[in-house]
Amino acid sequence: MSTARSTTHLVLAAEAQDLLFREARTANTFTDEPVSDEQIREIYDLVKYAPTSMNQQPLRIVLVRGAEARAALVEHMLDNNKPKTEKAPLTAILAADLNFHDHLPKVFPHAPDAKDYFADDDYRAESARFNALIQVGYFILGIRAAGLAAGPMNGFDAAGVDKEFFPEGTHSALVVVNIGKPGPDAWYPRSPRLEYDEVVTTV
């Protein structure tokens, strides 16, 4: 049931609002039900429309399925994140491609010189991470839209993950996300949210 004070101006169905926002939680435990490549493909085909500056789309996703790869990832997680990452049916490493500009001639074709805007390495890396994080938020919503739960974490050794999974040095790990159906005691009690008047000002 919707808990919104008012949804008069929202066109999305109340059930969808609840699925994506009000009733969605960060899961810490999962069932054994597998998450298929087809599910992830459908999620991506939905969330690929997230807005990014100059359509740069720097997010890259590594699906960790193999036992050896999972064990390697777990080694780089903080202790409280190790058990949930070991047991989740699927874990994804979300990273920023620091060479996203190589794709700009394809994805931003009306500006043939767009790639040149990002010649500076530091500026390009900052833009890659910023825009990839926008895509991360959309990816989490896409997981929820598929009826799954997401457990995003930034409690890990990012340098270690980069060395393990991106040894070429052109990607920067941002978030690790466990994905699946929520298991027993999957979440803590809902923490308070700031209210509208605490966040929004008009000038």
Annotate the PLM regions.
Residues 47-48, 92, 112-164:
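Small-aliphatic-rich amphipathic alpha-helix that forms the alpha element of a beta-alpha
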Residues 82-85, 91-96, 167-188:
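A glycine-rich helix N-cap at a beta->alpha junction
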Residues 56-59, 145, 174:
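Short secondary-structure junction motifs
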Residues 2-101, 200-203:
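N-terminal amphipathic, basic helical "cap/leader" segment at the start of enzyme domains
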Residues 72-74, 103-105, 186-190:
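Short, well-ordered secondary-structure micro-motifs
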Residues 76, 106-107, 164:
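Residue-level signal for well-ordered alpha-helical positions
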Residues 182-203:
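C-terminal domain-closing interface element
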Residues 104-113:
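Short, flexible, mixed-charge acidic loops at enzyme active sites
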